[in-house]
Amino acid sequence: QLLPIVGEKAMLAQTIDRLTGLVPVEDVFIITNTEQRDAVLEVCPELDPNKVIGEPIGRDTAAAAGLAAVLVRRVDPQAVFAMLPADAVIHDAAGLCKTLDSAFAAAEADPVLATIGINASLPATGYGYIQQGNTIGDYADKAVYQVKRFVEKPDLATAQSYLDAGDYFWNAGM
């Protein structure tokens, strides 16, 4: 996340750049492990040091999301926030921002936990899948759906059946 693996900037810096125009940099919180906190500030000096949080105990994504929710709520109890992994390779930043804008609008209308699905292009066994449920509505010109179910990393035959069904998406982890 702190190296320029894809492109000229560190992946974390690219993640922050993608949000330009949607989320002001002063509203960005980073949850990282304690050992990497200083390196994060070195790679992204525009960040508020008080909003770069070293996890007291490294756990999993759910624990980091919970910590982020508590910290954001302290600043603004009505805030809507997103969890974005720093290691995602995203070529369509504008498309991501449009999707996030729709998710934010849906969450503001009816407090929900939103997740992003990626159109599956092959039967991948290394990704979790999201099965699309009923339409909730249109928000910011995009349809938003309920999640019917989550499936963790299926075998190849099951992944192929999901691709054939047409209502399963790769779980973006966002």
Question: How would you name each of these model-derived features?
Answer:
Residues 1, 7, 73, 135, ...:
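Residue-level marker of positions within ordered structural domains that often coincide
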Residues 93-174:
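Conserved core of the sugar-phosphate nucleotidyltransferase
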